């Protein structure tokens, strides 16, 4: 609309709070903005915001624990909201929840009976009348076997071979340090270095990339370690590195039972446990990494076996070589369960879900493609071709605005399924709270007007905003009323005079 040359812009909305930015709206010079706020009903709404699986590695037939984050976006308590978990179309859990107004509640759901392969999972709520956010999708892979890469100087370590041969779930592959396929490193959740006298610059750089992307690296120094090369590997990863070799009998003085590695290992820990005996060891440097945790320590709480968070991954460093000349650790009863726990904590699968519109980069294991073999996201007849970028150790997918519908998609290369990926809506839409008139006024420039809808029609509101309050109809009505009164008065007084003037 135009009013004396000025442009008028009308924005009609209920103005949910999630639409508001942190900065005020700027209007063009000569443009008048009118915000017409529709009156919205207050509706109850509960949604699943996110989920997380407690196990990093998923094994066939084993129990899984899923942490669910439930959010009540309404201003009143939600009573007994039914929730159902489906995995590959089969119901795995059922429950109901009462959540206080505007509250967040966490719950852990236990389920089992999974077969090897990709799992397509859905959480469903019954929460009427707002239903657009009643489904939450996620996916994960149950491995038939877990690959482990053992890198050494050319001679396999018998203790490591014995550990991973004890459980057929682990598929350990031995490779000498001069024959490593760097492109495949990202396919191994766990890489173990042992008996390497020196670590090459190229290997150190590749392992740094591997850890930053979420891999787990376990380092056992050799009998005669080149300490400079070990420092070049570990220092950039914010992990301790071996500094010097000390010879002398000592013993591990304690273990950190609070460390995740020892979770569920002991039913009842003895007061005087049998701990590894040490004949010689490397002193480990102090690390500035505040996310480090001792697994075992020597007298004076000197680190013996320690873990560090680095990038998206983990680094574990031992102060001894896997050799009985150093300690009896390789034959100790603690060695196998600790190694298993490190392996099972090492999973770095893809995220359980992605969010539509978040412009996230989707990272999958390396997939070789050519113009005739394109990667496609497929769901119930829909086929979307993402932009693909190859990086060392991974394939990156960029969706931009190609994807518009939530659900679970198969990432396919021709007829083979490379991965299964879940997408959900941004849960900011679930918050059905609205801006007040004062909050709207603070967001718009001085040249703007906030119009709150009421019983009046939108047409009358716009007319009043443009031309002011129109009184001409009222004036005409009042004029007619006054005219009628005047006519009545004239007739009354005229009749009265005639009656008075008549002779007696």
Which positions does each model-derived feature cover?
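Acidic, S/T/G-rich, low-cysteine, solvent-exposed domains in lumenal/extracellular/periplasmic regions
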Residues: 17-35, 155-349, 381, 394, ...
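Proline/serine/threonine-rich low-complexity linkers at boundaries of modular beta-sandwich domains
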Residues: 34-48
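Beta-strand-rich binding/interaction modules
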Residues: 61-98, 105-110, 118-124, 161, ...
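Terminal connector regions
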Residues: 112-141
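Membrane-embedded catalytic interface detector for glycan/lipid assembly enzymes
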Residues: 270, 308-314, 319-326, 331-493, ...
């Amino acid at each position: 609309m135009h009013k004396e040359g000025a442009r008028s812009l009308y924005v009609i909305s209920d103005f949910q709070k999630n639409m508001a930015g942190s900065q005020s709206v700027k209007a063009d010079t000569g443009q008048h903005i009118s915000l017409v706020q529709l009156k919205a009903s207050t509706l109850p709404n509960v949604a699943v915001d996110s989920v997380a699986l407690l196990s990093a590695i998923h094994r066939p037939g084993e129990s899984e624990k899923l942490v669910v984050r439930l959010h009540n976006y309404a201003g009143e308590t939600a009573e007994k909201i039914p929730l159902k978990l489906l995995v590959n179309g089969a119901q795995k859990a059922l429950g109901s929840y009462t959540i206080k107004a505007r509250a967040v509640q966490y719950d852990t759901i236990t389920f089992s009976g999974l077969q090897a392969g990709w799992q397509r999972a859905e959480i469903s709520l019954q929460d009427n009348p707002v239903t657009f956010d009643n489904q939450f999708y996620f996916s994960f892979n149950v491995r038939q076997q877990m690959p482990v890469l053992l890198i050494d100087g050319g001679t396999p370590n018998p203790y490591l071979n014995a550990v991973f041969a004890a459980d057929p779930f682990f598929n350990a592959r031995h490779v000498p340090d001069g024959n490593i396929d760097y492109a495949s490193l990202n396919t191994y959740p766990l890489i173990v270095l042992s008996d390497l006298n020196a670590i090459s610059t190229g290997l150190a750089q590749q392992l740094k990339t591997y850890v930053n992307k979420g891999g787990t690296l376990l380092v056992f120094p050799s009998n005669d370690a080149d300490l400079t090369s070990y420092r070049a590997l570990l220092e950039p990863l914010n992990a301790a590195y071996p500094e010097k070799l000390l010879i002398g009998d000592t013993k591990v003085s304690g273990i950190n039972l609070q460390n995740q590695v020892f979770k569920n290992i002991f039913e009842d820990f003895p007061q005087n446990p049998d701990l590894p005996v040490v004949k010689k060891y490397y002193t480990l440097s102090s690390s500035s990494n505040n996310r480090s945790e001792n697994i075992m320590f020597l007298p004076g709480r000197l680190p013996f076996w320690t873990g560090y968070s680095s990038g998206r991954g983990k680094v574990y460093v031992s102060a001894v070589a896997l050799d009985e000349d150093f300690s009896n650790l390789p034959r100790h009863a603690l060695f196998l369960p600790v190694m298993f726990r490190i392996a099972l904590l090492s999973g770095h699968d893809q995220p359980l879900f992605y969010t539509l519109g978040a412009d996230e980069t989707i990272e999958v294991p390396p997939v070789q493609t050519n113009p005739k073999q394109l990667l496609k996201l497929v769901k119930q007849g829909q086929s979307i071709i993402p932009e693909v970028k190859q990086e060392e150790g991974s394939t990156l997918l960029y969706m931009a605005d190609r994807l518009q519908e939530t659900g679970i998609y198969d990432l396919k290369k021709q007829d083979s399924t490379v991965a299964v990926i879940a997408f959900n809506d941004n849960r900011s839409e679930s918050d059905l709270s609205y801006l007040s008139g004062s909050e709207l006024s603070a967001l718009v420039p001085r040249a703007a007007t906030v119009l709150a809808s009421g019983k009046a029609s939108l047409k009358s509101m716009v007319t009043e905003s443009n031309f002011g309050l129109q009184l001409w109809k009222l004036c005409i009505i009042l004029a007619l009323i006054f005219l009628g009164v005047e006519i009545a008065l004239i007739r009354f007084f005229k009749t009265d005079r005639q009656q008075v003037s008549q002779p007696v």
